[in-house]
Amino acid sequence: MKLYKIILSVGFWLLTTQLTSAQENNFMPYDQAILGSPLSFKMVPIQGGEFTIGSAANEKGRNADEGPQKKLSISAFWMSAYEVTRDELDIFLKDESTSLNVSVDAITRPSPQYVDLSLGMGKQGGYPANSMSQRTAIMYCKWLYQKTKIFYRLPTEAEWEYACKAGTNTAYFFGNNAADLDTYAWYEKNSENTFHKVGKKLANPWGLYDMIGNMTEWTLDHYDATAFEKINNEQLLIAANDAKYPKTLKGGSFIDPAIELRSAKRFHSDPIWNRRDPQIPKSKWWLTEAKQVGIRLVRPFLEPTEEEIKQFFKAYLNL
């Protein structure tokens, strides 16, 4: 199993950076227009800081892979206020200026879905994009970079959990009482087995909607059940991994019970998510058994160089 050593560097990833006054003035919420369309998406600033990743040993529903808890330092970034919608993703899917080949250096447009993987739950008007592979999610980020000249990517697991917890240490960002979930999340009990338009529940304390429930969200990380045991010096080092499975997801979804929506809960991808795909070889782009999987974007405050961005996409799309 090969690890691509692009260990995520200072300012680019997880080392805390104190922002200057001038930088603070530029670290504001903004709306990112998607060129060639009337659509935009909102980005929320997330200040850097320290937090404790994982769950307490006595947290109800805790799994062994959520520990041991470790303190991490996180650098500043923006995160999308909402999950990426199908309306937004469709602009990429229908962009005929992109390639249909599989070159790593090209912006490669995913092949069409074999069947409608929204399964009648909703596509236009603010419904979340679903059933895409991690590769599709990262290629969408590469396409956005081409269109906007701004580097967007998936969050690391640590960034995601830091943003979800929003300064809290409880099972959920609103406390420990799962009875309050209806206010913040679509999950097994209230979803009627369908995903819902983004942003219809209350946001977490940092202004992020649907962080728990609705869609389980991809992160960059390869899943390792013992990852937290390997954290040293308050840093979680991430490298691109050429194994297709398993990758880490966070947040729980509309099909999950309340206990699965805890901030520290970890999910991982599984080959059975493509079990019903009739194509040979099976699609790199779509997951026939993962109707609950979606994405959310981040943008590091300190922009990496053009060469670093090139190496990032080369590593993560050469899987």
Where are these regions (language model features)?
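Bacterial N-terminal signal peptides that target proteins for export
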Residues: 1-8
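Bacterial N-terminal signal peptides
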Residues: 9-17
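Disulfide-stabilized, aromatic/cysteine-rich ligand-recognition loop
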Residues: 23-24, 28, 202-204, 234-319
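Mature N-terminal segment immediately following signal peptide/propeptide cleavage
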Residues: 39-53
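Short loop/turn microsegments at loop-to-beta-strand junctions
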Residues: 42, 150-151, 203-206
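Active-site microenvironments of metalloenzymes and redox enzymes
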Residues: 53-60, 73-174, 221-228, 299-319
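Short, polar loop/linker segments at the starts of domains and inter-domain junctions
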Residues: 55-74, 195-201, 261-278
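Short, well-ordered junction/capping motifs at the entry into regular secondary structure
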Residues: 185-212, 240-243
